[in-house]
Amino acid sequence: MENWAVQSPEEPGFHAVVTPDKSSCKEAWIYRLNLNKGDSHTLKSGRLEMHPVLCEGAAVLSGNSALEGVRLEKYDSFYIPGETDVIITAQEDCFFYVAAAVCEGYGEIFVRKFDPSLPIGDIHQIHGEGTGRREVMFTLAPQDKASRLLCGFTWGGEGTWTSWPPHQHEADLEEVYCYFDMPKPHFGFHISYLKSADVEEVMAHHMRARARRRPKHGGRPSRCLPCNRSPFR
């Protein structure tokens, strides 16, 4: 469990953060794209489906007829299936987390604009109660046309749990948590354990803006320090 946390790079460029050949994950890839204002990057999906989510800044898309001229602002996202290219140009300094998985030939390009006013339903959801209450906003929902990926944002309250009680999805999901919006001195803890309902042996990882991977076993409550929120996607 010691190596389950990975610091995502902050320098400009397109960076592989979690990949099956270098982690315990077998199905999931996570990339981070950092662009300075005015810089561009051509995203090429190849054999993967990709889901970039803008966590900071603003950008515009080009080079693909289905996405031409689309402007992205904070928390907006889009999806591309395999063998698809798109140019991302930063209108402000920005960074994306990019989730990816093997494309099985199923998936359609789409853009999802972040809308916090959406009613509770398929995209906007509330889970848990009390200090375990959390708000979920899907960026790539179960009903969307994609091969393997499910993605979304989760926000907890200030100083509360964002995943409580401890639970896991090892029967059918491999999960990666990408933390954001926690600049210094803000931080939280991601607590990992291997055996269901056995929390005697746990590992706590310090979290700011980094990725935390988890294979198909173990659990993961996460906790934010007082006066902080612990958002992840």
Give the predicted meaning of each segment.
Residues 41-46, 163-169, 205, 223-225:
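Short histidine-centered beta-strand/loop micro-motifs
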Residues 72-91, 99-101, 204-229:
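Conserved metal-binding segment of the jelly-roll/cupin
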Residues 73-130:
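Hydrophobic alpha-helical segments and helix pairs
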Residues 177-180, 224-233:
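A short beta-strand-loop micro-motif that forms or neighbors metal/cofactor-
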